[in-house]
């Protein structure tokens, strides 16, 4: 009897496997379309995946850039079940993000986001539709408007002063600047999100950083081969990620409830205020009936997670790449410090109103965003209908990936693109706000990063203070060329190794 059961199980397993294999081969054969953009050859089941092997898999934008040199700036890849079109030129960026922006306003939800309970309700991956339009409007008009970002200056001023105090306490010694900057950025984002009265703020920051790191470690294979979702289950990564979210959500539940109780105790009399945090704003909009679609506490948590995921690592990564490039380029460091110290001469404290005319420092920031773009592969889009682009057809449901790294290093656009040359942005109208397709670190069109102004503000003030209050030296007798500039690909593309420097106080 046992043998019959085993035989039945074996036969059933074989039939299921055979049908699965047949379906994959059938899908592969029927995915061939002469009008698709050109791309590398495909094999059954894996598609074009084998062409990425041996091409720096750890940094996939390198591999995609190499393939684009062979197959062109609009390239099709079949990665398992995923049909992917990769754009690698400013011309293709404009064609897609401007001329076809509405048709590709959908954003595919990756497997790692689907693991979490809030998938599809956060700012980054909310599906195109009425709720997306509402959350986009709230982000632009309420959460991250220029006025709102400016109103939060007191948080950045306070936290950047604490950053300087912490560094000054270790002056003359080797410090881990990566940890210092990460703590500053995370605390600014936390205070902007839910105020400064949260007793578990540090715990939530720790959990959010762990969650971003854990999300970056989850395999992307299930996006290409859905049946391989079990990998993250048996590896424990799925459970680990969900446990972090569960623990952090308990803190957010308390924070939201405290905000509601505080509003009730004040009789809802305060209304809009420059010192409202994100939770305050969302609760006010819900209470006053200004929203067409009701926002639940779960939606508020999803927004907060979006702000942390998009606002912490991106800003701290940018600051650290700026400092890294300045340490590698002493003449640029000398020039930018001369500007900062001349403009702020004699000041013992620096406010945001003091740094509005630091033209060269902003050029340094732009050049760092070009050369060391935090998101070298912009968050993908999805075609909601068939498109014709540059004579090729992109079928509906095709994922569209923008290789911004390839564009910001295109020698046809940028002279000496591998070099750090901030002067290229002096008296140059090119900006990062989404209308110059050769420089789109925050994306463009309907899906441009809504927190762009917030992210830039979180870099400018601490950077000005780091350059003003300290002279900087590499440790252990290192020379500029010795500094390791290896990147690590993840949710953002930051330094693989922490940045260790020696600060010496500058007497203004």
UniProtKB/Swiss-Prot annotation:
Primary site of residence: membrane
Binding site residues for heme: 449
Record field: transmembrane: 6-26
Keyword Transmembrane in record: yes
Localization terms from the record: Membrane
Keywords: Heme, Iron, Membrane, Metal-binding, Monooxygenase, Oxidoreductase, Transmembrane, Transmembrane helix
InterPro entries reported in the protein's UniProt record: Cyt_P450, Cyt_P450_CS, Cyt_P450_E_grp-I, Cyt_P450_sf
EC number: 1.14.14.-
Entry annotated with the keyword Protein transport: no
Topological type in the membrane: Single-pass membrane protein
GO CC, any one term: membrane
Cofactor(s) needed by this chain: heme
Recorded catalytic activity of this chain's protein: tirucalla-7,24-dien-3beta-ol + 2 reduced [NADPH--hemoprotein reductase] + 2 O2 = dihydroniloticin + 2 oxidized [NADPH--hemoprotein reductase] + 2 H2O + 2 H(+)
A Pfam entry, by short name: p450
Enzyme class: oxidoreductase
Expression sites (tissue/organ): Mainly expressed in roots and, to a lesser extent, in stems.
Pathway annotation from the record: Secondary metabolite biosynthesis; terpenoid biosynthesis
Family label: Belongs to the cytochrome P450 family.
General function of this protein: Monooxygenase involved in the biosynthesis of quassinoids triterpene natural products such as ailanthone, chaparrinone, glaucarubinone and amarolide, allelopathic degraded triterpene lactones inhibiting the growth of other plants, and possessing antimalarial, antifeedant, insecticidal, anti-inflammatory and anticancer activities. Catalyzes the conversion of tirucalladienol to dihydroniloticin.
Protein's recorded name: Dihydroniloticin synthase CYP71CD4
Name of the gene this protein is made from: CYP71CD4
